Amino acid sequence: MPNVNHSGYSNMAYGHSYYDYILEIYEYVHQIFPLSKNREDNFIAGHSMGGYGTIKFALTQSDKFAKAAPLSAVFQAQHFIDLDWIDFSAQSITGENTNINGTELDTYHLLNKAVENQVEIPKLLIMCGKEDFLYEDNIEFIRNLDEKKIPYTFEDSSGEHNYAYWDKAIKRAIEWFVE
C-alpha cells in the first residue's frame, strides 16, 4: 500500500502531488505486471483516510474501478481538516483557505459532480464499526447516497476505528470484490 502521509490523497498546496502519485502507481503497476486495465477487473479499498481516498478515486476515476470499498472512511473531510493535528498542518493540503466545502477535497461535492455528469459510479461496499468515531459520518454519507438513488451495500458491525476492525473488513471487501 502506498504511503501518502497526511495528504488526504490530494495534490497538496504545499507538499507533494499525492493524487497524481496514486494515478502513476496505477499506471506503473499495469505496465510491469500482466494485469487487465478493464474497469471490471479493478477495485479500490482503503480504511480511514484511505477510505476517503477510496471514495475520492471512485468518484473522480470511476472509469478505472468497478468496485470500491471505503472502510471507516473519512467522508466529512472538513472534520479531518479541522482536527488539531500535532504532526502536520492542514494548510499543507488546502493552502490558505481551510474551508474545503464545495471544493475537490469535499466528497459531497465530488458526489454531486459525479451525479451531475452522469458518471457510472463503481459499486460501493461501505463498512464501518458501530463504535467508530466516524460511524455517524458514514451514516450521513449513505443517506446522501439514498437521496441521490445511488446503489451501495452498507455493512456495520461491532468495531472501533482500529486495525482489529479493519483486518476483518478488508477480508470481507476482498470477498465482495470477487463475488
Locate each region found by the language model.
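Non-catalytic cap/lid and distal C-terminal segments of serine-dependent acyl enzymes
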Residues: 1-179
